Amino acid sequence: MSSQMLYNTQKIRGFQHERYEFSVGKLIWHIKRRKIQCSHCGNEQVRTEVLKRRRIRGLPSGTAEVFFEFDVHRLYCPKCRKQKMEELHFLSHAKSRMTRSLERTVLELRKHMSIQALCRYFHLRWHTVKELEKEALSRKFRRIQTTHVKAIGIDEIHVGNGKENSGFLTIVRDLESGAVIHVGDDK
């Protein structure tokens, strides 16, 4: 398997195929970095330390689950004197356990399938799919344009019943478009 196959199927750049292994319903690709360089200055003369071996989930191949296994390095650059973890561009964040391409595919299919159907197809937990959806929505609505808002409406809603489980939610909306600008706890 070439590095071109890694990129074309999974959008993984800068890594090359070492070996692969099959077990029942699983394909595990062992990959390694082609060249290690400082992400800050681009220097290739860096000292590396292997911190751990990671296994992340990729897009399935047919009915087989695909996993990628690789070493994660800590880098020290003598040129810019920075010490940092290597950047993994095919992950959405440092602690992600699946590739960006798998996350994107799950989110695209979520528009047409139920969470339970996605979980069965990709062998994921329900909470994993729900968290992906929450993160995508928070990224989408992180910055709401308020420059064109001329009039707002503020609602305070009582949530819960009784004294222990009750509270208020404050909702701020654009009165013209009806878009929610802010949702906050308490009054």
Which residue ranges define each predicted feature?
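Short, conserved catalytic/metal-binding motifs centered on acidic residues
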Residues: C38, C77, L118, I152-H158
